[in-house]
Amino acid sequence: MAWFSGKVSLGGFPDLTGAVNKFQESVKNIEKNFDNALGFDDKSDSAAEDAASSMWPPAVDTKSLFDPVMSFMGNTSDEKPDTLEDSVRTENPSQIEQKEEEAGSVKLATEQAVSVEANKETNVRREADQADNPEVTETVVLDPKDDEPQSQILLEESSEYSLQTPESSGYKTSLQPNEKLEMTASQDSQPEQPKSEAEESQPEDSEAKEVTVENKDTVHSPVLDGQHKITYMDETTNEQEILGENLEGRTSSKNFEVSPDINHVNRIESPVAHPSLIFESDGSPYESSIPKRSSSDEISERIVDFVSREIDSRLDTSELNESQRSSSATNVSDSADVILELEKTKKEIKMLENALQGAARQAQAKADEIAKLMHENEQLKSVTEDLKRKSNEAEVESLREEYHQRVATLERKVYALTKERDTLRREQNKKSDAAALLKEKDEIINQVMAEGEELSKKQAAQEAQIRKLRAQIREAEEEKKGLITKLQSEENKVESIKRDKTATEKLLQETIEKHQAELTSQKDYYSNALAAAKEAQALAEERTNNEARSELENRLKEAGERESMLVQALEELRQTLSKKEQQAVYREDMFRGEIEDLQRRYQASERRCEELITQVPESTRPLLRQIEAMQETSYRTAEAWAAVERTLNSRLQEAESKAATAEERERSVNERLSQTLSRINVLEAQLSCLRAEQGQLSKSLEKERQRAAENRQEYLAAKEEADTLEGRANQLEVEIRELRRKHKQELQEVLLHNELIQKDLEREKASRLDLERTARINSSAVSEQLPIARQNSAFENGSLPRKLSSASSLGSMEESYFLQASLDSSDKFSEKRSMPEATMSPYYMKSITPSAYEATLRQKEGELASYMTRLASMESIRDSLAEELVKMTAECEKLRGEADRVPGIKAELEALRQRHAAALELMGERDEELEELRADIVDLKEMYREQVNMLVNKIQ
């Protein structure tokens, strides 16, 4: 390959990045082919990220593998945050442009300093070269006019060393103009070499160009997913740094005499230019799978090998360069530059040795881990082989034999290819054309390794699925046993409930019959007593009504006669009142006329008096005084007559009001008389009836007293029986509540078991679908892998023994990892169940195929269906029992209601007795009231007569 060529520049590794990219591309292509074959293209990104996060370690571990490699490539641990920031800056183009502008300003300043020093050195070297080599093919003049064509040539050369084209991959790499100017400045600062050295460097450059062209044709796809994106960006930035060093190394290989300032500037500027490499994803429909730690370990080991060999080649080249420089050195300045460069190379060699030692330590640790994992894998393989021997399934054995055969063939191929690779590497210093073959071999090795890894993954996934199915079958059988035991217990409970039900029904029927007979007898007795009492009451009421009617008619006649007499007297009184009113009016008119005449006379006398006063002298004044006295007396008499009139009017008004009140009183008295007469008649009738009833009731009372004594005795007996029935009913209620509670609990348990069974059925269905999918995928994978195996059979050279190669170690490590994970998951899943099944041994369970699983699942489904039917029947039985319990409780409530009616009947008897006593009391009270009413009537008559006499006297 090209990086093993003898003339490699000390500034960087020109073809190491191409080799790493080629290696990654081959791994990605193999993974893509396997994913296309297995049909994993349609999987979502979320599933891939979840699988990556659960199965593989974070990106920090992959970074630690590449730290020593990055250290001797010019990046230390302090530069890692810059690379991380560069990876983040790909999402923010505005920030990237700002950083690029800052980097460009720094580079322009450094270029100006470099160009000043380069002009001085070129003038000195030109004279030395012209003196030694008169024939010069190329002349470099550091003029501003000649910078443009040289920069164009360098840009064309730098485009050949670009990582990849946008057409061939999903990423874009662009060199910034500042970086291009840096390259032109570094090349312009170097002196020209003789024609012989230029001709020697041309074939090497052509070879390197061919390698880079081949690298262009390869497809770069994103390897890392999810959490590993940052590490991938770190690797890409490291690769871009190596590319920049390669470009600088190629420019420096033309002239070995480079000033330390220029090298220092290039080293400073190289990491600054790396953020200009922008990777833009074209959004390809396919996303590659996650790289394993084993592939990264293999890459690190190979990089360590490459670095060790390149250090040897560098030492050889440095010795050649020193010999050439010692022979061609003519000036003291050149020798000083060579010494400085040798010191720098020694420092770089020391750094590389330290990095190699760290990488070797890590590789040794990884090798130890791989050896341990291989040992565990061998143990697990021995266990699996023992289990395979005990299994009876031919399909599983055939698949495993095919897998082992494929793994053996792949290991043989890997061994053969590694041998071929070693031979090709030895011959590479002589033949540059063998680089393409080695790359193809590396790709084939990577493909074989990926096939082995995927086969181990598939086997681990199948074993995990088989274990899951076994655990599900165990769970189903355990649940089946639990359901059977619960069904038996429920059947026993139902039988006991039925027995209790029959016993309670018998007791309830007996008690019901007894109470019904007692109630019928008591109802008949009390109904007869009530009918007799009602008949006696009706007869007494009829008698009293008849007597009261006759008395009322007589008294009404008497009251009518009295009313007619009173009406006549009132008419006479009204006539007298009208006559007296007329007389009073006439008298008033007479008095008014007299008063008017007197007033006229008074006025005339006043006039006369005034005239006489005016005419009569003082001698006649006593007469005037007499006249005035007469006038006063007349005035007083008039006032007295007015007062008499007023008193008479007031007496008239009072008499009228008294007459109205008397009429009202008369009416009220008449009403009261009628009411009292009616009441007297009613009471007299009632008295007669009650007297007749009294004799009958006295007789019936004696009979009822005898019956009451008998009823009391019966009541006490019935009360005792009712108390016993109430106690029994309370016991039955408690038992019914307990039965209901038990039924509720059993129902809840049955519902929970039904839910669990449904969940298990869903799980079994899902696992069944997964098995069918895996079977289809395996069949498709087997059908696609057969032609691949036939094509790869041409590479087999006999049956070589197995060795602990990198591919086998990686495959075994992944297989042991998946086996351990599946074993842990199965153990945890089995520990969750409390009753493990001892009949199904793991050796027998591993021999079961998906068809057998389907058969067992169908059996389990049938059993579950039968259990569901039995549960439905049990639920129907439970419902019928609940209905019967409800009926029995209703009957008990009816009996209780009838028992509660007994004290009501007794209360009715007591009420009848009280009514009888009250009737007797009423009889005595009514007699007293009649006597009082008669006395009141006599008093009213006397009062009425007195009032009438008073009115007559007043009127008179």
Curated annotation (Swiss-Prot):
The keyword Transport does not apply. Residues 77-89, 118-129, 206-219 have a biased composition (Basic and acidic residues). Residues 160-177, 184-193 have a biased composition (Polar residues). Its main location: Golgi. The modification Phosphoserine is found at residue 793. Residues 333-765, 851-951 form a coiled coil. It holds the Pfam family TMF_TATA_bd. GO terms for cellular component: Golgi apparatus. The C-terminal domain (817-956) is necessary and sufficient for Golgi and cytoplasm targeting. Interacts with RABH1B and RABH1C, but not with RABD1 or RABD2A. Golgi matrix protein playing a role in tethering of vesicles to Golgi membranes and in maintaining the overall structure of the Golgi apparatus. This is Golgin candidate 5.
